[in-house]
Regions:
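Phosphate-binding and hydrolysis-coupling loops of NTP-dependent motor/remodeling domains
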Residues: 7-9, 27, 50, 84-85, ...
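P-loop NTPase catalytic phosphate-binding loop
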Residues: 1-103
Length: 162
């Protein structure tokens, strides 16, 4: 993706997602989780530039068209995925498209459980230097953790959970 190009932002989510409360116009396109694979595949045929694809609760999004898997493998170089999911829901999905994303060992774990979330992207320190309150956790780049504050409790209340 060229640094000068601003990507379209597409989102995949269902009615249980906090993204349903996003202000109008935040996303260029929105896809329902249940049929997202086919819809995104069709939309990619018309994409005129780079795309940032946000997928909330990726563990609940199937990929019968293998489009998400193809994006992760680099078949669509101008399309990038940011996917969310709970580690306990993602871990048992051995043949799911999200497994390929986890192999990059790059992501974030918010308020991690050190007993169950230790291996999502890399090793989480057993003891945090501060309390891991709302929005706090670790970001990983190639398996190396960095303590982060991704949002504040006030943001969560004002934005309907976003």
């Amino acid at each position: 993706m060229d640094a000068a190009e601003v990507p379209e932002v597409w989102a995949v989510f269902d009615q249980r997602s906090g993204l349903v409360n996003a202000p109008e116009g935040v996303f260029d396109r929105v896809f329902e989780s249940k049929n997202a694979s086919a819809q995104v595949q069709a939309a990619l045929q018309d994409a005129a530039g780079p795309v940032l694809l946000l997928i909330d609760d990726g563990d609940r999004v199937d990929d019968p068209m293998n489009v998400f898997d193809a994006i992760v493998k680099g078949d669509f170089p101008d399309v990038h995925i940011i996917a969310t999911g709970k580690p306990t829901d993602l871990r048992p999905l051995y043949s799911h498209w999200t497994k390929a994303i986890r192999k990059f060992r790059t992501g974030a774990v918010v308020q991690p459980n050190v007993d169950t979330d230790m291996d999502m992207f890399g090793s989480i320190p057993r003891r945090a230097p501060v309390q891991l309150s709302v929005g706090r956790g670790y970001a990983f780049l190639a398996g190396s953790p960095v303590l982060v504050q991704l949002m504040s409790p006030e943001d969560s209340q004002h934005r309907g959970g976003l």
